[in-house]
Amino acid sequence: MSKTMIITDTCCDLPANLVDQYDVEILATTFNIDDRILYEGIDFSQENFYEILPAPKDKIKSVSIPAAVYLDRFKNAASCGFENVIVIMTGDDYFPMHRTAQEAIDLYKAQNPTSTLRIEIFNSKNPSMAAGMLVLEAAKLAQDGTSIDEIMTALNEAKVSIVIEGPDGKSFDQLYDSCAESLRADKPDYAIGYASRKKEARALAMLLEEELGYAPITLYKLGAISAYTASKDALAFCFKA
């Protein structure tokens, strides 16, 4: 059996109850807010992020994870007997974490030239729970002892559909119609829906359950990285075929 560590960051918005079920390393994303360095999940939670969110939002200067943090996890993986590490990145390529994770890999190889630890980066190209669902998929396979090549193949083949609420003023019926149309067209393995109000999110989840024929696996609050375009009561829901 292959032993693979799965690493991601708090930008994936995985709910704590799901994280607890699997052996996933969740790294705290660092925010430079008004020249203060704060760590998501340590210095603030999803709930109180809105209390520290400055106005204007341009006071948030950077969102990152230092290369040293990744490097520490790689060393820990090797010392704990892991043969492989998969770092699942959230967001687009311009997120600083993509660069610092690669820097950490280069540093690890330079410092440990005889190490057999294999480290792979998987770019989910998705934000929030759309990346989180892929993390869970990888974690399940890793727990079963699946080889790293098979896990990477599964990640590349996974279909994720993100259905995001339209502009302000969009009626609930319009929001539902657009979500249902996308789900029918794509038939994704996973579907992620967002609504600005809890009431709408729950109602939308119930309607889509009827449409899809299976219930959502979770409802969750958006994390800090997703909060820029969401209201305080924003909620999202996830379906799995």
Label for each model-derived stretch:
Residues 3, 11-30, 36, 75, ...:
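Mixed-charge interfacial surface used for oligomerization/domain docking
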Residues 3-4, 82:
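Local beta-strand N-terminus motif with an aromatic residue
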Residues 5-69:
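N-terminal glycine-rich anion-binding loop in soluble enzyme alpha/beta folds
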Residues 6-7, 61, 87, 121, ...:
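Short catalytic-loop micro-motif centered on adjacent basic/acidic residues
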Residues 57-58, 64-106:
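Glycine-rich phosphate- or other oxyanion-binding loops that anchor nucleotides, phosphorylated ligands
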